[in-house]
Amino acid sequence: MDNEQRLKRRENIRNFSIIAHIDHGKSTLADRILENTKSVETRDMQDQLLDSMDLERERGITIKLNAVRLKYEAKDGNTYTFHLIDTPGHVDFTYEVSRSLAACEGAILVVDAAQGIEAQTLANVYLALDNELELLPVINKIDLPAAEPERVKQEIEDMIGLDQDDVVLASAKSNIGIEEILEKIVEVVPAPDGDPEAPLKALIFDSEYDPYRGVISSIRIVDGVVKAGDKIRMMATGKEFEVTEVGINTPKQLPVDELTVGDVGYIIASIKNVDDSRVGDTITLASRPASEPLQGYKKMNPMVYCGLFPIDNKNYNDLREALEKLQLNDASLEFEPESSQALGFGYRTGFLGMLHMEIIQERIEREFGIELIATAPSVIYQCILRDGSEVTVDNPAQMPDRDKIDKIFEPYVRATMMVPNDYVGAVMELCQRKRGQFINMDYLDDIRVNIVYELPLAEVVFDFFDQLKSNTKGYASFDYEFIENKESNLVKMDILLNGDKVDALSFIVHRDFAYERGKALVEKLKTLIPRQQFEVPVQAAIGQKIVARTNIKSMGKNVLAKCYGGDISRKRKLLEKQKAGKAKMKAVGNVEIPQDAFLAVLKMDDE
């Protein structure tokens, strides 16, 4: 293909994403677009086609972004090449969304005709506007009995500033309005810029590991051309590789001769090491490199840390390999080795949020067959010590002694909640209970209010979202962003079993709630830890001070069962012997702690 043909082809390329709040019908719309452009044989069609992970189908959510090429015969007689990049909608996966958007020129904004605009919709719209994308608003599910398309149209105009006349009414499930959406994509989404003669610049927006072919990187070509046999250079590391295959996803991988300006496809270059193909890096040609890399993504820092330990210590190295492979296409995952007296060797792992953590844990157990114990998640605290030095703590067990600490800072987030009017009181009460600071409140219309609070991240990551949903009968939507670290009066609470500290059960809590939390946790542990042959005291302590205590009663064993009638001194002798045995057992006794006990730390509320 010569450059003239490449430029002509570029004019007919449209790169777009679909963005939406969870459950507004994004994956269904993607299915219909695939079906209507005849990209998938009818026999291969299944729901949520682009959600390739079993886990995604089971939970009905999109976790990983996916890119696919479609051909569309438009009414103007031209054939267009569409690259659809499917994105997740959950707040934990905002990073995946920002990666998808960096590879696009436009985005379809899907809004549920019954629910209207929700917090996550707005968050994704701002991301799209930051990337200077053209937006195509679609109101989905218009055939629902509760649908109010006219109200939602007005909302889109008032809150996002898009013209009502540009809104497409659709129902992905019933295949209504899909043809109109496809025509609008041609009209609204601009063709990509870029020069096929310039030095190659390709953005890696995703990558996965194949045991036979090495690393497969998903790329968007911004300038230049790449084909098999080219020697490429990674601009972040300077490492060079020879390209063995370039291709496109249709959704199956299909090798092609070359990828040129505006194309979205994949590249394989015998890259064996996960670290050599980092998401956000720029690929260029070794023989004619670009002068500067493309602007990558802002690195997402983990918000929540927890310890992952294999139940069988033999699996320690397998766990490392599993984490490395997952990290390849999940650049926000971080991990480092950690050891715990209670659990042996494992990894301290950083996640974007609780859903992200659950999913990584489930993927390790499913895809790699490693059984795990996870400790209670914790956020990152900054401690300024009395000697002026600073310490970062992501594991409560490593918190310095309170008398050495001058100040402790914890991360705060700005939380935006959209709530029906009737539940404003309940939501504000929940935020106050979670140490929130009221910022402002906006009445969006007669039905809904937008409430903004500043909250400590530690209170948000555990079960805030679940409680928000239950306090509003499931109607609230929620989004948060990190703002800053603020000074707080925090203490470390240790849990002692049989007089020994269990490092994996330590947690950090605000001093005002320490007593209630400690009391609630020891009572909870009493029910979760199985009874032993001896009595086990469970204590919660701050430093040297015990703030709560309870005992797990011993299992009774009747040593007198064989003693029929007979002498009282005989019975006494047996009882004394049992007592001595129990004392000895207690001195060396090891208490088995089930997985539920580690998670009990989370499930407490301050009530």
From Swiss-Prot:
Protein biosynthesis found in the keyword field: yes
GO BP, one annotated term: positive regulation of translation
Record's bilayer topology term: Peripheral membrane protein
Xref: Pfam families: EFG_C, GTP_EFTU, GTP_EFTU_D2, LepA_C
Binding site for GTP: 23-28, 140-143
Cellular component, GO annotation: plasma membrane
Key words of the record: Cell membrane, GTP-binding, Hydrolase, Membrane, Nucleotide-binding, Protein biosynthesis
CDD domains cross-referenced by the UniProt entry: EF4_II, EF4_III, LepA, lepA_C
Broad class of where this protein is predominantly found: membrane
GO molecular function: GTP binding; GTPase activity; ribosome binding; translation elongation factor activity
InterPro entries per UniProt: EF-4 (IPR006297), EFG_III/V (IPR035647), EFG_V-like (IPR000640), EFTu-like_2 (IPR004161), G_TR_CS (IPR031157), LepA_C_sf (IPR038363), LepA_CTD (IPR013842), LepA_IV (IPR035654)
EC number: 3.6.5.n1
Compartments (UniProt record): Cell membrane
Entry keyword annotation includes Cell membrane: yes
Family: Belongs to the TRAFAC class translation factor GTPase superfamily. Classic translation factor GTPase family. LepA subfamily.
Function: Required for accurate and efficient protein synthesis under certain stress conditions. May act as a fidelity factor of the translation reaction, by catalyzing a one-codon backward translocation of tRNAs on improperly translocated ribosomes. Back-translocation proceeds from a post-translocation (POST) complex to a pre-translocation (PRE) complex, thus giving elongation factor G a second chance to translocate the tRNAs correctly. Binds to ribosomes in a GTP-dependent manner.
Designated name of the protein: Elongation factor 4
Lineage: Bacteria, Bacillati, Bacillota, Bacilli, Bacillales
